[in-house]
């Protein structure tokens, strides 16, 4: 009798884990939540459009780059000539950094200039605040939160 209960319990546990993993995969879960190396969003990063912009942070907000992706963080940067959305990365990664970027900070952002929903934006590779640098992507645009590198 105990072995039958054990089999039923183990089966229920396995099914529960499998269903949970399937739900995570549909939302991006372990694959970066829509922010990973192979995601449609990440493929917008173009090393030929990398530039550095400087300005003052006007807003720091969460956003979802597309349906089904986990929330990310972007900031609105006011430069001398424009107001520009700067996409930093997934919220779970940005919010777990030692330092934070605040409204009013003067920053230098290096990243790929893209059109996002018809508006200019920068997908950030790094953000410099004083002497501190928040590294978000390598020179190829591969996110540091991916946990691995392609050679």
Regions found by a protein language model. Give the residues of each.
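Bacterial N-terminal signal peptides
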Residues: 8-18
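Short boundary/loop segments of OB/S1/cold-shock single-stranded nucleic-acid-binding domains
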Residues: 29-52
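Structural detector for short beta-strands of small beta-barrel domains
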Residues: 49-69
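OB-fold and OB-like beta-barrel modules that bind single-stranded nucleic acids
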Residues: 54-57, 104-112
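OB-fold (S1/OB) nucleic-acid-binding surfaces
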Residues: 66-88
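Short nucleic-acid-contacting surface segments enriched for D/E, G, S/T with interspersed K/R
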Residues: 93-109
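OB-fold/S1-family single-stranded nucleic acid-binding modules
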Residues: 114-143
């Amino acid at each position: 009798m105990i072995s039958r209960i054990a089999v039923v319990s183990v089966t229920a546990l396995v099914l529960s884990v499998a269903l949970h993993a399937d739900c995570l995969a549909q939302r991006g879960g372990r694959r970066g939540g829509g922010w990973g190396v192979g995601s449609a969003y990440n493929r917008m990063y173009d090393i030929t459009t990398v530039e550095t912009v400087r300005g003052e942070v006007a807003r720091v907000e969460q956003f979802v780059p597309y349906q089904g992706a986990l929330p990310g963080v972007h900031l609105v940067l006011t430069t001398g000539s424009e107001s520009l959305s700067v996409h930093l990365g997934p919220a779970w990664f940005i919010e777990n950094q030692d330092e934070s970027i605040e409204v009013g900070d003067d920053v230098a952002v290096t990243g790929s200039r893209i059109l996002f929903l018809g508006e200019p934006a920068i997908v950030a590779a790094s953000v410099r605040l004083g002497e501190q640098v928040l590294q978000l992507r390598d020179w190829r645009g591969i996110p540091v939160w991916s946990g691995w590198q392609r050679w």
